[in-house]
């Protein structure tokens, strides 16, 4: 790949934005989820047993162990961590000098700290993905103390940035593979999307319209999903810029369509940021510079071979798609018919055959990046800077190879026979770092749930056990006439767990018993998870005496439907009781709370009069009235506006001053600068070099 300075800058900016969304979204939910009287109090995860600080840190790597030393309870420590993470993220979004390796190290440590006590509400694949991507960002980001200029590209940066591409490959390839290895009949029958839009956790209004699309188009969309997730990721590592750009737009299209039709918090945005690893700076430059570059190729050269490789790759991709999904154009119905033309055994055999070749392909790509980094290090002028660049190249090459090696363990979970063939030392190394979430396995939408109707838990409260009132949530489906919300990048973690709870028995979701108990107690923090505007909560005046939960099946209404449901988004049917009628002091409720260990007494509350706890309380009281999506959307819009003004005025003034300086230089100086920049361009210096090289880099930025 070519120069990656601009792409890396965009990636670091994007990761800063993802951290902002993750920290601020979680911050708004801490009191209800993890408070002393929340659904799953966080203090339960940190038992002070008399061990030393470092022993505790090894058992559970989280900064929350320091909470008592600064006068904070566990949930207050979580609030402080999320606020610090939000502030650091905002700073990194606004100021490039904060997009530094040390800053991203702090962000990663902060998110790992809350993850360790997050329990079931933080056990999502995108939380693990953020931790892995966040750790890789530490390696990708510049360490300002080791660089003479903040915007200079180092020889080893292409090596560490390759790890982002490898992570993207593992994420997409595994997500496609597990759909078939799960033996889910809807994925094999190509009918998964006829259920997906109405059965996903929190659909958007666009999902209703997507659900109305004809079945043949839904099946063709599943085929396209397989191509994007299983076939195209192999192009990530081929030596063709055109194939990588094609891969980039394919992945972006899939993620954008998912964002439009579903509320998946920051997950798809994070995937889009990872997709930047498929580009280089040439893709971000103007067409004029691209045209000048294109004119250099003459005759049958490397460029011609690359074109042949591109045509071969596109041809094979199209051929295999048509063959294995039996694509046929139906001119009578103006449709494209499709069906799987291979068996489960065929797919397993293919997967087993190609798992290790995929590793070899990735290793060859990494090897090229390492060799190219060595060449760039050797091309730097000056003995000292050449030696310094070589030392960095060695260190980061070993770090990259180490991360790649460890990641092979979770990657080969897609085929356990391949996983068993890895060296025992690789498994041992993985087990040592597993607690830090450095590498993870992925596989989204393994099975399509909700076939035959979307299961949904409806909570009801009553004062007299005769008249029952439904308790509506802000985001999950409930009221059949309420339109689906648009809340990305916020993740209402209670609503998400309600979706999972509906897929099984309430005993499989112990937190639900605690949730019901808190509603009976009238806990305000838990109520705000249900309705941020307490006036919309039906039991705002006093808590209900009785609570129960019913299981319903929900379906989207059909297009053109008339009658009573014409203006409704949903239709539903009662299935059975999900949770029995309980009340405060009820023996059944007390038994379930004891069974799940939810009756333990919390430690004594710390004083709120100290400066730090009182400051945290002031911030909480100030932000409490505002819904989380409003906070996130407002802050993101403000940051984008500020960045735009910085680019408009700051960039313009820098360009003007640079141009003025270049015109004011004597002719001899210009010749010297031209010669020095040409020399340093051939070596792509990253850590040192002459003044002309640095000047040219600054003008480009």
Predicted feature locations:
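Alpha-helical membrane-anchoring segments
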Residues: 1-701
